[in-house]
């Protein structure tokens, strides 16, 4: 017991179609000494930087990479615009409010405090485009996300559960139910979408009718624990989804983290990119955020906030200032000629 080393290796996520090559099981070498195996363990920070080259093209890690959901929605957006042009729909059917000299319309959604209802609608729309415009050839399907193997309710799963794409309203109701019961914030919804796209990229899988509920559930579960100050426990989700067990939730969370390679970091630049891309998605699909006329109270509040930011900016610039002389009253020293005799 004192001179032997034991290692517990967790089982990798089971695959249904292709072998998962990103996660390699640990194989101890009997020829290595204890010094070679114990002192040269890889640090977790080194493991996170393995795919630095691929990270530049991963939208959930790099702020300059385009989000996947926005690119998947472009085809449908172009078709909608084309149909509107062909059918000669008048622009008056879409009621939009525009600011004028007398009235200014603003929405209450900002990057730091997004509107909860419309953020969930945008996230549900992004998930809808992920499912609708997925790879037609079909990629591998992990058992842990298969709703037939791990049902969320005791009701019988229909035999064609993996054939029909869910509607946007169905996805919205599912996400809204979880957010309302767990009292999650709008920021958590954006982080949920970041984790979802990171999972699809890292694990090289597609979200489809057979697995979308459990993938979304795992992303919400992880985002609520990472982002919110008052994290929701797994047993709380079991009270929301009455027929799911705590063991199933624990296994879902464990394998989700494993497939993310334990990379739960969301930089502020990536978060801001997803927020503004969601706004672009909403505008392209006529899902506008609620606009309200600018009131006097809100104008004073915005003025106070801007003045506070301006004062902070001035305080930061003060140590950097250098005194300089004006050229108007510039007096140069005059040298009197010296007589050398």
Swiss-Prot record:
Q: Which UniProt keywords apply?
A: Cell cycle, Cell division, Cell membrane, Cyclin, Lipoprotein, Membrane, Myristate, Phosphoprotein, Ubl conjugation, Wnt signaling pathway
What GO cellular component term, any one, is given? Answer: cyclin-dependent protein kinase holoenzyme complex
Q: Name one GO molecular function term.
A: cyclin-dependent protein serine/threonine kinase regulator activity
Residues bearing PTM Phosphoserine:
21, 25, 33, 71, 73, 83, 99-100, 102, 280, 288, 295, 324, 326
User: In the record, which positions carry Phosphothreonine?
Assistant: 30, 37, 67, 75
CDD domains assigned: CYCLIN_CCNY_like
Q: What topology does the record note for this protein and the membrane? A: Lipid-anchor
- Signal sequence, start to end: none
Q: Which residues form a coiled coil?
A: none
Q: Name one GO biological process term.
A: positive regulation of autophagy
List the subcellular locations.
Cell membrane
**Role noted for this protein:** Positive regulatory subunit of the cyclin-dependent kinase CDK14/PFTK1. Acts as a cell-cycle regulator of Wnt signaling pathway during G2/M phase by recruiting CDK14/PFTK1 to the plasma membrane and promoting phosphorylation of LRP6, leading to the activation of the Wnt signaling pathway. Recruits CDK16 to the plasma membrane. Positive regulatory subunit of the cyclin-dependent kinase CDK16.
Instruction: Please state which protein family the record places this protein in.
Output: Belongs to the cyclin family. Cyclin Y subfamily.
Record PANTHER family? CYCLIN Y, ISOFORM A
Provide the protein name.
Cyclin-Y
From which source organism is this entry? Answer: Mus musculus (Mouse)
Q: What is the lineage of its organism?
A: Eukaryota, Metazoa, Chordata, Craniata, Vertebrata
């Amino acid at each position: 017991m004192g001179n032997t080393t034991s290692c517990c290796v967790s089982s990798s996520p089971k695959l249904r179609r292709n072998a998962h090559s990103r996660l390699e099981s640990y194989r101890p070498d009997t020829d290595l000494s204890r010094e070679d195996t114990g002192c040269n363990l890889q640090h977790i920070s080194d493991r996170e930087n393995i795919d630095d080259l691929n990270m530049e093209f991963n939208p959930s890690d790099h702020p300059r990479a385009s989000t996947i959901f926005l690119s998947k929605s472009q085809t449908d957006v172009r078709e909608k615009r084309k149909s509107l042009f062909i059918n000669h729909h008048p622009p008056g059917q879409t009621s939009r409010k525009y600011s004028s000299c007398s009235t200014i319309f603003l929405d209450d959604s900002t990057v730091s405090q997004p509107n909860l209802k419309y953020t969930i609608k945008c996230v549900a729309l992004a998930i809808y485009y992920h499912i609708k415009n997925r790879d037609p050839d079909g990629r591998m399907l992990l058992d842990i996300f298969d709703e037939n193997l791990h049902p969320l309710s005791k009701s019988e799963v229909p035999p064609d559960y993996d054939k029909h794409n869910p509607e946007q309203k169905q996805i919205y109701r599912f996400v809204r139910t979880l957010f309302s019961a767990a009292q999650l914030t709008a920021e958590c919804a954006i982080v949920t979408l970041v984790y979802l796209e990171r999972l699809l990229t890292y694990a090289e899988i597609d979200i489809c009718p057979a697995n979308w509920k459990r993938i979304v559930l795992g992303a919400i579960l992880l985002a609520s624990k990472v982002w919110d100050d008052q994290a929701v426990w797994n047993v709380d989700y079991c009270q929301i989804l009455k027929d799911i067990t705590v063991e199933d939730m624990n296994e879902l969370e464990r394998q989700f983290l494993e497939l993310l390679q334990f990379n739960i970091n969301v930089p502020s630049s990536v978060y801001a990119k997803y927020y503004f891309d969601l706004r672009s998605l909403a505008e392209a699909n006529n899902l506008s955020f609620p606009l309200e006329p600018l009131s006097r109270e809100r104008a004073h509040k915005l003025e106070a906030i801007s003045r506070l930011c301006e004062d902070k900016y001035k305080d930061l610039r003060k140590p950097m200032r250098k005194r300089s002389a004006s050229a108007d009253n510039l007096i140069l020293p005059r040298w009197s000629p010296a007589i050398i005799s």
